[in-house]
Amino acid sequence: GDVYKRQDEEREEIYVVGSVFKIQVYSLSGNYKRTLNLPYDMSFEQVFDYDKDSLIFNDGREDVDNPVQKGTYYYLMSKTDGGMRPLPFHVKYRITNRFRIRLRNGDRQGVISCMFSVKPLLKNGDEVILSEFSNDTVFSYGKEGAKPLLVRTPAPRSTFPLKLMSVSACSRRFLFLDVIEKVYRRNIKKLDGDSFVYDYREKEIFTPVLVNSDFIPELPVEIDNMNGSFPKYAGASSIHSREFMQYYRRGNLQGRACEAASCLTRDDIYVLVLYHFN
């Protein structure tokens, strides 16, 4: 699986998620300090820095033969000793972002598995947005507990095929949503869904068009906050430095993008662009 890290500058620690079963903790200088282990019947799917004492994660373990499971999948984990505390969300009939198909050919059998790009957790500053695929309500969870953000209608299990919905970014007024049908299609390389925005003020849903006006002409933007910890009400996208410099040399950048390009070196690989929504 992928190796990724979370950093806590106040504790001067880095949390490396190199396995679905454990997190290794290092100092900022790279010295190993300790390991945080999961019980045998759990696995990490998403992990985020939550506060000075805790990480937050969801359990990715799935029993395809028993969809009615223990019902608790979201936890806070102590950064010190790995102790866990469940979040107050109970799921009876879980819907996951994974697809598994059992194939049989005579005496031989196998399993095809894939994972959809939508994910249930999103870090939003000091809060976490939880769009559990089985629930009809999207919540924001923080110091003051859970707060409902959006109620799905119709409910998830009343649609066929199932539609997985997650939050990709948010502002005080808008909630950015990704929706994808949970359908297996043969010989497809990428499973794309649809993007929508819910407007709290107008109480309407529409299809967004996001562009970066620092590019000439304006560059379409795809927000991807799923795997990072970003400031509240912000969105992130990335562009390869080589492509970014091509825009710069052709004179197709202006404003802060032009300033950023002038500072790049040959050691820079990707440029992270942070968008703040009003």
What annotation goes with each model-predicted range?
Residues 147-168, 200-232, 245:
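Conserved blade-ending motifs and adjacent loop-strand segments that build the rim/top face
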Residues 17-72, 86-102:
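Asp-box/WD-like beta-propeller blade repeats and closely related beta-sheet repeat scaffolds
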Residues 34-40, 83-93, 147-155, 205-212:
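Beta-propeller fold detector
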Residues 173-218:
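C-terminal structural cap/anchor segments
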Residues 25, 70-81, 135-139, 190-204, ...:
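Beta-propeller blade signature
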Residues 6-8, 12-18, 53-66, 75, ...:
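Short beta-strand elements that form the blades of beta-propeller/WD-repeat-like
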Residues 1-4:
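Short, small-residue-biased leader/transition segments that mark boundaries at the very start
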Residues 71-142:
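Loop-centered beta-sheet repeat module
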